[in-house]
Amino acid sequence: MRNKLLELIEAPQLRTDLASFKTGDNVKVHLRIREGEKERIQIFEGLVIKKSESGTREMFTVRKYSYGVGVERTFPTNSPSISQIEVLRSNKVRRKKLFYMRDRKGKSARLKEIRTK
């Protein structure tokens, strides 16, 4: 059980406007990037291989392949630089952390899709 005072302080800081997702989902993370005076949106699309849940310290890691090289990026869920998270596809997984996906490419990296009716 967590400290009640800590929960009371963290509750207003949690973001509720983002889509709910879990490990094994394919997501698009829309990031706000500031370059000098300008601001633009950059999209990072990939598979969620890790999600650690702990209030305001909640983090998730997304992995994708770019030009044949595996790229991983870790995001804080409650970060103001994340403008939107889109869930593209939900997959059936039995693990909370999918680090075994780092060794797989091509057909061996496929996951079974959960179809919604």
Swiss-Prot record:
One GO-annotated biological process of the protein: translation
One GO MF term attached to the UniProt entry: structural constituent of ribosome
Record flagged with keyword Metal-binding: no
Keywords: Ribonucleoprotein, Ribosomal protein
UniProt record similarity statement: Belongs to the bacterial ribosomal protein bL19 family.
Keyword Isomerase: no
Protein name as catalogued: Large ribosomal subunit protein bL19
UniProt-listed Pfam families: Ribosomal_L19
Residue ranges of the TM segments: none
